[in-house]
């Protein structure tokens, strides 16, 4: 006895309606067929998909479950059930459905991809990575899976792999604006700011109204110190989306750096009006008010930032700085200590804590002895360079070449040209015994030079090849220039020449000092210490590398 089923004409018409996106007609026909042929599994499955398309997920769930009941081995039906359950925020059940689809059809690339999405949503990124990779193995040109893999790798901080995956996405689909945007984000995290800029601009050319990319481009331009361009990008983002809170806040940061404090204040207040619990915007507003000399207002704003985010180390630190300027030194020290306790790696808080404790100890000593002479700047150093020497271990140079590095041209500071440098400013924290030995020796030399304890704020190495160098610069940052603390007078820069390279050339790498002008031709083992405020530059053109270690430090 044959089982009755719909005619081929009915099924062809149903499929045609669906393919032409005539979902109303498709639903009517599917419902009609299921009433006439209630055991016809395929029609129930199609009805479920139609209802997904029109957003009626609960009804779709019923139809799809019916199709699975009629044919439990239909992998596509289990896949559809996973889609529905995910849409209903039932992720754990969706995972089971996708896994069942894969069990029934192991080479089901789309199911592997969607399983990866669910695992990512559930916070199981390592498992998600495996699912996306399996989808790609099964379907190498699966653009969506490549993109999902890249995003997962980005979140797992496997940035080099993420970059490769995003580039693969773009190779498969050159007009995919989101992939260009995500590549830009990855490149920015890798410190490749100029390349990130190119990716963002490509995304914008493909999708001019891509608001988030205008904002991200602004952040990159800001990091490249192209502040006028950054301002334009933020304003474009705001024009596209007037309630874009982050763009208003970022615009405020740029305007402050441009010295347009009143405008910066307005931008921060706009961001706060859009998002009253935006602790970072409160903190930035406090900094602007502080710079405008409105210290009482700044204190209130910093306290609001802390109320919104009690573990906000930067806000505690800024409150401490503000209280110090108001003359409340004990309360200031308490705030700085809180910042340091919250984030022991917060460089500014660590520095200020050292400086403030040192100053307090000195003041107490002076008050006890009656000696009120200010010894803060009696370091034994003037604006003139101090020239010293240390024997260079050859293995020290070899170790620097073995360490991870970045190209000079990839930095955003004064360094440029051929050569490489340490990836960060924490060279002295490297555990190699040879590095620890040189750090110990140089620290002792610093202390003897300034006649006090010291706090090292940064340490690094530079390896200059022909054409490498540094533009005129000094080593003062915003905190050093803050007249409330006057730290610039306590800051010094040291350079230790391990190998001077080839000095028989037109550009032998003279250390050029400014105001007053002075030229120093380095020799092997030379250590030069100058005030961090003194401008200096160097250009090197030799055939062999010049190798040096640098450090910036404060006298305490």
Predicted regions and their residues:
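Conserved alpha-helical positions within TPR/SEL1-like repeat arrays
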Residues: 15, 42-53, 64, 76-87, ...
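Catalytic core of non-heme Fe(II) oxygenases with the double-stranded beta-helix
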Residues: 451-540, 545-556
């Amino acid at each position: 006895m044959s089982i009755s089923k719909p005619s081929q004409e009915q099924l062809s018409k149903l499929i045609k309606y669906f393919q032409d996106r005539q979902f109303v007609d498709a639903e009517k026909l599917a419902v009609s067929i299921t009433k006439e042929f209630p055991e016809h599994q395929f029609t129930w499955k199609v009805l479920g998909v139609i209802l997904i398309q029109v957003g009626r997920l609960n009804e779709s769930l019923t139809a799809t479950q019916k199709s699975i009941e009629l044919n439990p081995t239909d992998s596509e039906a289990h896949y559809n059930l996973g889609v529905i359950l995910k849409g209903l925020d039932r992720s754990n059940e969706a995972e089971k459905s996708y896994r069942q689809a894969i069990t029934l059809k192991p080479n089901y690339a789309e199911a592997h991809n969607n399983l990866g999405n669910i695992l990512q949503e559930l916070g199981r990124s390592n498992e998600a990575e495996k699912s996306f990779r399996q989808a790609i193995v099964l379907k190498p040109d699966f653009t969506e899976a490549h993109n999902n893999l890249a995003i997962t790798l980005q979140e797992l901080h496997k940035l080099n792999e993420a970059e490769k995956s995003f580039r693969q996405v773009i190779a498969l689909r050159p007009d995919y604006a989101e992939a260009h945007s995500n590549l830009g984000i990855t490149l920015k995290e890798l410190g490749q700011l100029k390349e990130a800029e190119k990716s963002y601009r490509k995304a914008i050319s493909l999708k001019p109204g891509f608001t988030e990319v205008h904002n991200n481009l602004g952040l990159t331009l800001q990091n490249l110190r192209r502040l006028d361009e950054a301002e334009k990008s933020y304003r474009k983002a705001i024009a596209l989306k007037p309630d874009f809170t982050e763009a208003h806040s970022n615009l405020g940061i740029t305007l402050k750096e441009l010295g347009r404090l009143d405008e910066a204040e307005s931008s921060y207040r706009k961001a706060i009006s859009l998002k009253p619990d935006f602790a970072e915007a409160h903190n930035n507003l406090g900094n602007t008010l502080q710079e405008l000399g409105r210290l009482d207002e700044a204190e209130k704003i910093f306290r609001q930032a802390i109320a919104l985010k009690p573990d906000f180390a930067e806000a505690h630190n800024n409150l401490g700085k503000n209280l110090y300027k108001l003359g409340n030194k004990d309360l200031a020290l308490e705030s700085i200590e809180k910042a340091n306790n919250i984030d022991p790696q917060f460089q500014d808080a660590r520095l200020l804590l050292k400086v403030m404790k040192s100053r307090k100890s000195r003041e107490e000593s002076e008050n006890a002895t009656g000696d009120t002479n200010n010894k803060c700047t009696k370091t034994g150093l003037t604006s003139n360079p101090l020239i010293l020497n240390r024997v260079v271990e050859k293995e020290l140079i070899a170790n620097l070449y073995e360490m991870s590095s970045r190209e000079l041209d990839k930095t955003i500071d004064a360094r440029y040209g051929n050569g490489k440098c340490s990836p960060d400013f924490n060279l002295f924290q490297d555990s190699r015994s040879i590095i620890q030995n040189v750090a110990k020796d140089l620290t002792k030399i610093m202390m003897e030079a300034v006649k006090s304890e010291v706090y090292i704020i940064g340490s690094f190495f530079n390896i200059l090849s022909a054409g490498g160098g540094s533009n005129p610069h000094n080593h003062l940052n915003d905190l050093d220039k803050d007249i409330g603390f006057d730290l610039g007078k306590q800051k010094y820069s040291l350079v230790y020449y391990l190998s001077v390279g080839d000095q028989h050339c037109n550009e032998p790498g003279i250390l050029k000092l400014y105001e007053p002008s002075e030229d120093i031709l380095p020799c092997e083992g030379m250590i030069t210490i100058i005030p961090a405020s003194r401008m200096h530059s160097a250009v090197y053109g030799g055939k062999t590398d010049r190798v040096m270690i640098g450090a910036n430090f404060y006298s305490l």
